[in-house]
Structure formats: structure tokens, C-alpha cells
Amino acid sequence: MKSVRFRDDGGYTRDGTWENGTIKFCGKSYEVDEVEILPPSNPSKIIATGFNYEDLIDRLDVKTPNRPRLFFKTPNTITSHNKIAEVPAGLSAVYEGEIGVIIGKQCRNVKVGEEREYIAGFTCVDDIAIAEELEDDPGAVRKSGFDTATPIGPVMASMDLVPECPDMEIRINGKVERSTNFSGQLFSMGEILAEITKYITLEPGDIFTTGTPIEPGLVSDGDIVEIYIEGIETLRHGIRLAK
């Protein structure tokens, strides 16, 4: 099943299902562009993973991590389908298509192999990052923590719908820029969850990512970014470079 949170024309927040591009709720059908699509969950925290794919590590010639390389993204970074991500003034940015893993129930000290008990489903994530090298920013607060830096959505797809290594396609203004899949992980979803929950309690709705398998691509003011992940849907958002 693909669940979707949306705001109807009466201003009410609804939890519907996404069926072939149409939203269903209580016997009514809505076209996607008729309603405001909301983030698929309201996380108290987002934990992102960097440099988790062998091909990307080889391309960028960075040191292979010995354990998942994690960093925080706070709720202010979230925006949703069909919204605008605004990059701080004077800076440029890159897109990074990723799988977002949505937690279904509170968890701590999860063991590898137990992860499916705690995962509600998957969504698309664009972990937008500042392109410039920023000094004195070891936790990526400036680089990846600015408002609207994390478009997510449009749905939460149940685990049975998403292959183990799904295909991903990224389009900019309708043109395919990247086409790849999520094979070649250094650390599996279960290993990442185990590492996070060794230290941190995750709550329902919290999200972690498994990282991007592709080299980030530069975006321009006014661009429309689309991230398709097999089994989920296509996340679409705009880019604004603040003046």
C-alpha cells in the first residue's frame, strides 16, 4: 500500500491511499494537483547517512568509513511534494536522491535482522546540500541543515512494494540527469538502524536515510527536480536560490 497525507480543499489533514496517481479517502477521489501533499510523517528527527555506496566512494575518492557515517537533520529542513526548496543567499546547491526509511514504532538497541519489526515504510528523499565547501561545519548544520533542505514524499510505500535494490531516476526540468540503482551498499538498512539505535531512541515517524548512490548534481534557480524510486513514486519539488 502507498499511504499519503494531504490537506483537502476544506483545510483538513487527511490520511489517504495513493492509487495510480489518484488519492483515495473515504470514498472520494482527488487528483494529486488538486490538494496539498504533506510529508508522509512528522519526524522529530531525521538521521542521514553519508558515503554508503561503493561506486560513489570510488568516484569521489574519499576514505571508506568503518561504520555508518551519520548526521542529523532537524524537522525545519523538511518540505514536501510540489513545494519549493530555498537555498540560502549567495550559495549554490546539489541534489542527492535517497531512500527515506520511516520508523513505525519506538525502538532502541535494534539488532540486525530485527529491522522489519520497526519500519513502517519507505519514501523518496532529496538530501539537498550546499555545493560550496563551508569552513567550521563538521556536523553539516549549514551544509545540509538549512530550512527546506529535505524534500520528502510524496507517499510512504509499504516494505513489500520496494525491491531490495530499487532503480532510481533523477530528472531536472524533465530531462533525465541520473539513472542508477541502490546496489553496492557498504552498510545495509538493518546495520544502519542498529548503529543509530545503539545511541538514540527513534520514535514513530522518525526517518533515516541509506545515503545516495550517485554523484550529487548542481541545481539552478527555478529548476524542477524529480526523483523517481522504483516501488515508491516520484517526488517533485522546485529550487529557489535566495538573493
Annotate each predicted stretch with a short phrase.
Residues 7-8, 38-41, 62-64, 70, ...:
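Solvent-exposed alpha-helices and their adjacent loops that cap or buttress functional pockets
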Residues 52, 76-77, 104-109, 125-131, ...:
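Short acidic/polar capping segments at secondary-structure boundaries
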Residues 17-19, 33-40, 56, 86, ...:
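Catalytic-pocket segment enriched in acidic/His residues
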Residues 63-81, 95, 226-230:
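Structural signature of FAD isoalloxazine-binding scaffolds in flavoprotein oxidoreductases
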Residues 1-68, 159, 171, 175, ...:
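N-terminal non-catalytic cap/leader segment that marks the start of a structured domain
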Residues 44-47, 68-70, 76-77, 98-100, ...:
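Structural motif
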Residues 96-125:
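RNA pseudouridine synthases
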Residues 31-35, 64-65, 78-91, 137:
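Short acidic (Asp/Glu) patches
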